[in-house]
Amino acid sequence: MGSILSRRIAGVEDIDIQANSAYRYPPKSAGNYFASHFFMGGEKFDTPHPEGYLFGENMDLNFLGSRPVQFPYVTPAPHEPVKTLRSLVNIRKDSLRLVRYKDDTDSPTEDGEKPRVLYSLEFTFDADARVAITIYCQAVEEFVNGMTVYSCKNPSLQSETVHYKRGVSQQFSLPSFKIDFSEWKDDELNFDLDRGVFPVVIQAVVDEGDVVEVTGHAHVLLAAFEKHVDGSFSVKPLKQKQIVDRVSYLLQEIYGIENKNNQETKPSDDENSDNSSECVVCLSDLRDTLILPCRHLCLCTSCADTLRYQANNCPICRLPFRALLQIRAVRKKPGALSPISFSPVLAQSVDHDEHSNSDSVPPGYEPISLLEALNGLRAVSPAIPSAPLYEEITYSGISDGLSQASCPLAGLDRIIENGIQKGKTQSKSPDSTLRSPSSPIHEEDEEKLSEDPEAPLPPSGVELVLQESSSPESFGTEEVGEPSLKQGSRVPSIDDVLQDGSPQHHGCSQPVPPADIYLPALGPESCSVGIEE
């Protein structure tokens, strides 16, 4: 399902719970709501901004409840300042919606009465265990023996409890429980801060019997209603809470970490749209640093270090930030015969002096991209058309005056020559339409390629990739204006030596598979050429 990071502090906190001791922001009486420091990753940090919530708006703290709770803290391990909590249930808040019922027989009205407007709630959820889901309307929250308990002012505002087995993408629908908004006041549609009344609460409690490990686990979705000018209603999610080991955690979104692979592909004319996982500053390294309190995951480690000393605004929303949080994902190293499976373990890195890949990586694990750990391997977009296949012919003279190291295709020419030397000059093939119109091939050039039959064949399964040549001259292209050229008249360009990539082999007992060269979209200063056999 997911992982939640929490800090563990040694000792037991004793709080005197009184009826009139209510926490809310802003506080009714004068005094400090926050301390002068905070703990993260097992280290203590001073608060540069007084009375500031580090992970969001200060008003978000009102969703945690107005009364303090008493619970013990587990003594942390010396080498594990951060504990990973497992989330067994997750309600997809974006899937929450209202379904209206228009059956007049179910909503009779008398003269002078308001017409009844009946709605029901539907949503999608994931569960790694058996769960029991209950809906509460106009409910207040209380903690009893470490468990979150919700109560409604009217029993008719509480639905029956529905039990589900474990599964992913399960649909919740309960037509028997209908919400009649004709009986609601306008101020009851929104969250009442003074009385602590939530318009609607969806509670999913793990129901695994006497299993001690999951006792007290629950997921809570808080939502409100909106009334439109046409008289219709809609539901708006407010916050989500996760109760793990009888401790309530407020969930906050991280912007820029969503799974873009599962979204529908929409054509866009904006090529610079933010649809990748690279850092928004350098556009090369992967994002792994979170900006607080705006919660934008948009920076890599090196750019985050630069931003700490040169600016104090988020590059996305331009709001001032108070902390930078690096989130690192690791996975277990696969065995020799075991398939690769993603088992992300999130770890925070607060050391800004060392950023090597081996920092804070447990033994037996290897660091991976955070987005790949949560969303899986990134698939190639099907909207990108495949480039035509070409074969390249060896040539000489183009790198006169240049060293061997400045010609990245030098080691590539021998392999390509070996794959083509068996071919003979042939007439126009059916797939000759793939031939570039600006690259005429001469018969004498093709005859010279077949003069060396003793060269060894390329090994099977060879795959070579060349990345970003240091000498753009070796990749320069020229337009050929004349239909034919005399051999030796001038140095041929790379366009002059491209030909069709499907030669037929004759006079060979075992046919050799052709070498395919795919050419992606080439920029003016760099080139990426791959050979796959």
Curated annotation (Swiss-Prot):
One GO process term, biological-process aspect: protein polyubiquitination
Pathway the protein acts in: Protein modification; protein ubiquitination
Residues lipid-modified (N-myristoyl glycine): G2
Record has Ubl conjugation as a keyword: yes
Function recorded in the entry: E3 ubiquitin-protein ligase. Mediates TSG101 monoubiquitination at multiple sites. Plays a role in the regulation of endosome-to-lysosome trafficking. Impairs MC1R- and MC4R-signaling by competing with GNAS-binding to MCRs and inhibiting agonist-induced cAMP production. Does not inhibit ADRB2-signaling. Does not promote MC1R ubiquitination. Also acts as a negative regulator of hedgehog signaling.
Domain notes: The RING finger is required for ubiquitin ligase activity.
Name under which the protein is recorded: E3 ubiquitin-protein ligase MGRN1
Gene field: Mgrn1
